[in-house]
Regions:
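Hydrophobic residues at beta-strand termini and immediately following loops
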Residues: 19, 123, 212
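Short acidic-hydrophobic surface loop/beta-edge motif
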Residues: 5-9, 19, 31, 127-131
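Short, glycine/acidic-enriched loop or turn micro-motifs at the edges of active sites
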Residues: 35-36, 46, 73, 96, ...
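Active-site HxH/HxHxD metal-binding segment of metal-dependent hydrolases
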Residues: 39, 46-131, 217-221
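Conserved S/T- and glycine-rich ATP-binding loop of Class I adenylate-forming
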Residues: 31, 69, 141
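Conserved beta-strand hairpin/beta-sheet module of binuclear metal-dependent hydrolase folds
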Residues: 11-58, 150-160
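Metallo-beta-lactamase
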Residues: 105-107, 128, 135-224
Length: 224
């Protein structure tokens, strides 16, 4: 676990936890409302048993959603097991929904992965994903994939493979685009307040989190 926070705002007692899971340095996030005991996972790529144990230790006994920031296999390979254990509904951006269930068999074999069930809910820009009284706003941030999305929550943004600490997502995959990715970062992420904490989709940087202000000043790929 790299980041741990509990925040009380009004009636909301919010849990935010960061975990590095699997063999590909994927960051998974547990977010929930202690009062209602509802939670969700962002990109639970591996170790469903361990993640659920963590959720219960923080009083989150009902995992309502699995939110995928995009459809690439390293982020969705834990979906099937998590759905089996929790009955949680899968959420993904509408432009990545088809790709979620079309992972090539050779990639599944290469990653030792099980195919994901289809999405239960498809979202788009500006929609709200809610667990208890905790609300995450969908930011469509394509470029790494057509339906890549980030999630904005109370001074935090979960950026998937759009923006990393000191780096950005690859754009050499089918459906990727450097111009689109750069536009997403500039128009959707760099417009957020500078103190907004960046929670990336992989542990690729010098630290597990960053801020919008830091990335605008120091990210060598996209300067603000």
């Amino acid at each position: 676990m790299n980041y741990s926070s509990k925040k009380t705002s009004g009636r909301i007692s919010m849990v935010v936890k960061q975990y590095e899971v699997g063999n590909f340095a994927v960051f998974c996030y547990l977010i929930g409302d202690e009062e209602t005991q509802e939670g969700l996972f962002i990109d639970p790529a591996d170790d469903a048993k361990g993640l659920l144990s963590e959720a219960k230790s923080h009083g989150l006994n009902k995992i309502k959603y699995i939110v995928n920031t995009h459809s690439h296999v390293d982020h969705i390979m834990g979906n099937a097991e998590m759905v089996k254990k929790t009955g949680a509904k899968i959420i993904i951006h509408e432009e990545d929904a088809a790709a979620l269930v079309r992972t090539p068999p050779y990639l599944l074999e290469m990653f030792g992965a099980t195919a994901s069930p289809p999405a239960d809910i498809q979202v788009k820009e500006g929609e709200i994903i809610q667990v208890g009284n905790v609300k995450l706003k969908v930011l469509h941030t394509p470029g790494h994939s057509p339906g890549g999305m980030s999630l904005h929550l109370d001074g935090m943004v979960f950026t998937g493979d759009t923006l990393f600490v000191g780096s950005v997502g690859r754009t050499d995959f089918p459906g990727s685009s450097w111009d689109v990715l750069e536009n997403s970062i500039r128009k959707k992420l760099y417009v957020l307040p500078g103190e907004t904490v960046v929670f990336p989709g992989h542990n690729y940087g010098s630290s597990p989190t960053s801020t919008i202000q830091y990335e605008k000043r120091h990210n060598p790929f996209v300067r603000g």
